[in-house]
From Swiss-Prot:
Ranges for domain NR LBD: 273-509
Free-text comment on this protein's domains from its UniProt entry: Composed of three domains: a modulating N-terminal domain, a DNA-binding domain and a C-terminal ligand-binding domain.
Region described as Modulating: 1-144
Known partners and oligomeric status: Binds DNA as a homodimer. Can form a heterodimer with ER-beta.
Mapped zinc finger ranges (NR C4-type): 145-165, 181-205
Gene: esr1
Family annotation (PANTHER family): KNIRPS-RELATED PROTEIN-RELATED
Compositional bias per record (Polar residues), positions renumbered to this chain: 56-66
Domain of life: Eukaryota
Cellular-component GO terms for this entry: nucleus
Molecular function as annotated in GO: hormone binding; nuclear estrogen receptor activity; sequence-specific DNA binding; steroid binding; zinc ion binding
Protein name in UniProt: Estrogen receptor
SUPFAM superfamilies, per database record: Glucocorticoid receptor-like (DNA-binding domain), Nuclear receptor ligand-binding domain
InterPro entries with a match to the protein in the record: Est_rcpt/est-rel_rcp, Estr_rcpt, Estr_rcpt_N, NHR-like_dom_sf, Nucl_hrmn_rcpt_lig-bd, Nuclear_hormone_rcpt_NR3, Nuclear_hrmn_rcpt, Znf_hrmn_rcpt
Species: Pagrus major
Length: 581
């Protein structure tokens, strides 16, 4: 009835069953771990214990024998024209390469935005290929928190997140928590350090796409809520119909033009609630960049301007991607999009620089690895004055305790308000759809006022704060004009390489400000690509930002024409900015 076992030699046990006899050998050694890190200091674990190292399923991008490979997650959060496909993974000859295929909403801050040259390497042994195929089903079910990379408990507020980050975001949006980063707003948020800085953790939540109303579309309560909203909207339509019948003719015409003639994107922009506008603006914020320039201190005039222009060219690419995420911007014509960007690009970059430097008195944070103080600006003629104005405005931001919601509104207002008075300059064409731009501007201004009204202050204090915030824009415009003139003077002295996108923006600004129409420039007037100063360290790190943005020849130096000092000699079309848009 019961199986009888007999001990054999060599540690082999024989068990007799009714169907036959089975031999069980001694336990075999544990299989070789699938992944082994070649870089010291990383935790190594077998696949069957923790699953694959990626967030989702892995896709094979190559075929060949089992051999070591290099695994680098892709970076879909960045603009596609910023990084060519060869930057997403490193591949050797006849080596199978696997990369992550997780959507951008489930990934944390991209590796391309982190300063460092070390790559995460994983090697696959001979027995790993079979185990990898068997582990695909496990990988499909495993999710990680988009904020801290811990194991996700579910889909919360629009992204996969853990219980800790879900509860933290819920507390943050329900209460009035004025978090302040004790460092430079660059704290690392992971499983072990997510509680060290609440301000950076909340910023990370917004960066990965957490939203107040974000939830899965297949939830039943969403359908019930939609039904309730449908009933409410029907009642609102009925009440609006009565108001429309009794309204004066002028108001009636205004209502018809705003509802029927605005288009789908514009009408949805007008009806968007202020809280949703604020969430969209915060989610559109670009990541913090790295200069990756290996220039020794103290800086000279050439090295300083090389650093700044290289960073400006990189930020311009991200600024265009940021503008395209603004609600209603893509519904504008291409002419209006380019017009707004060309008129406000330096103001947008400057307010971003001031916001990054708000918690570091006396410092200007151009990038994670490029932090300058006032004394370092003395190496460039006229730069110390601009540094002083930037530091003074950052001090004013700090004194007003500017909040992230207010910052994103001011930044969008700068972009949209730049085309309000285009008719004042004879060489600048007016916007094709000025009414749509004004509607966008009104919507963002209403969102700013709505946020200020939620502060709990008196009506007088709320009105005073609105005025204080909007008055900052005139100072930023003044700094932008100073910076534009300084950059133009450096360009005329041939002391700094200017990349194609940056030079295109500078030329457009000079053309719009000219007293007479710009002359037609011929192809022969263009200068050859700048190479000598670039080889000395000028464009090593910045070339990646401009090359994939439509620039094919790298930085250029152009000269002022001796016969026409008011006209630049670099091709005056809008090819660079229009190509990106």
């Amino acid at each position: 009835m019961y199986p009888e076992d007999s001990r054999g030699s060599g540690g082999v046990a024989t068990v007799d069953f009714l169907e036959g006899t089975y031999d069980y050998a001694a336990p075999t050694p544990a299989p070789t771990p699938l992944y082994s890190h070649s870089t010291p200091g990383y935790y190594s674990a077998p696949l069957d214990a923790h699953g694959p190292p990626s967030d989702g399923s892995l896709q094979s991008l190559g075929s060949g024998p089992n051999s070591p490979l290099v695994f680098v997650p892709s970076s879909p959060r960045l603009s596609p024209f910023m990084h060519p496909p060869t930057h997403h993974y490193l591949e050797t000859t006849s080596t199978p390469v696997y990369r992550s295929s997780v959507p951008s909403s489930q990934q944390s801050v991209s590796r391309e935005d982190q300063c460092g040259t070390s790559d995460d390497s994983y090697s696959v042994g001979e027995s790993g290929a079979g185990a990898l195929a068997a582990g695909f089903e496990i990988a499909k079910e495993m999710r990680f928190c988009a904020v801290c990379s811990d194991y996700a408990s579910g889909y919360h507020y629009g992204v996969w997140s853990c219980e800790g980050c879900k509860a933290f975001f819920k507390r943050s949006i329900q209460g009035h928590n004025d978090y302040m980063c004790p460092a430079t707003n660059q704290c690392t948020i992971d499983r072990n350090r997510r509680k060290s800085c609440q301000a950076c953790r909340l910023r990370k939540c917004y960066e990965v796409g957490m939203m107040k109303g974000g939830m899965r579309k297949d939830r039943g309560r969403v359908l019930r809520r939609d039904k309730q909203r449908t009933g409410t909207s029907d009642r609102d339509k009925a009440s609006k119909g009565l108001e429309h019948r009794t309204a004066p003719p002028q108001d009636r015409r205004k209502h018809i033009s705003s509802s029927a003639g605005g288009g789908g994107g514009k009408s949805s922009m007008i009806s968007m609630p202020p809280d949703q506008v604020l969430l969209l603006l915060q989610g559109a914020e670009p990541p913090m960049l790295c200069s990756r320039q290996k220039l020794n201190r103290p800086y000279t005039e050439v090295t300083m301007m090389t650093l700044l222009t290289s960073m400006a060219d990189k930020e311009l690419v991200h600024m265009i991607a940021w503008a395209k995420k603004l609600p209603g911007f893509l519904q504008l014509s291409l002419h209006d999009q380019v017009q707004l960007l060309e008129s406000s690009w330096l103001e947008v970059l400057m307010i971003g620089l001031i916001w990054r430097s708000i918690h570091c008195p006396g410092k200007l944070i151009f990038a994670q690895d490029l932090i300058l103080d006032r004394s370092e600006g003395d190496c460039v003629e006229g730069m110390a004055e601009i540094f002083d104005m930037l530091l003074a405005t950052a001090s004013r931001f700090r004194m007003l305790k500017l909040k992230p919601e207010e910052f994103v509104c001011l930044k969008a207002i700068i972009l949209l308000n730049s085309g309000a008075f285009s008719f004042c300059t004879g060489t600048m064409e007016p916007l094709h759809d000025g009414a749509a731009v004004q509607n966008m501007l009104d919507t963002i201004t209403d969102a700013l006022i709505h946020h200020i009204n939620q502060s709990g202050c008196s009506a007088q204090q709320q009105s005073r704060r609105q005025a204080q915030l909007l008055l900052l824009l005139s100072h930023i415009r003044h700094m932008s004009n100073k910076g534009m003139e300084h950059l133009y003077s450096m360009k005329c002295k041939n002391k700094v390489p200017l990349y194609d996108l940056l030079l295109e923006m500078l030329d457009a600004h000079r053309i719009h400000r000219a007293d007479r129409p710009a002359e037609t420039w011929s192809q022969a007037d263009r200068e050859p690509p700048f190479t000598s100063r670039n080889s000395s360290g000028g464009g090593g790190g910045g070339g990646g930002g401009s090359s994939s943005a439509g620039s094919t020849s790298g930085p250029r130096v152009s000269h002022e024409s001796p016969t026409s000092p008011g006209v630049l000699q670099y091709g005056g079309s809008r090819s660079e900015c229009t190509h990106i848009l």
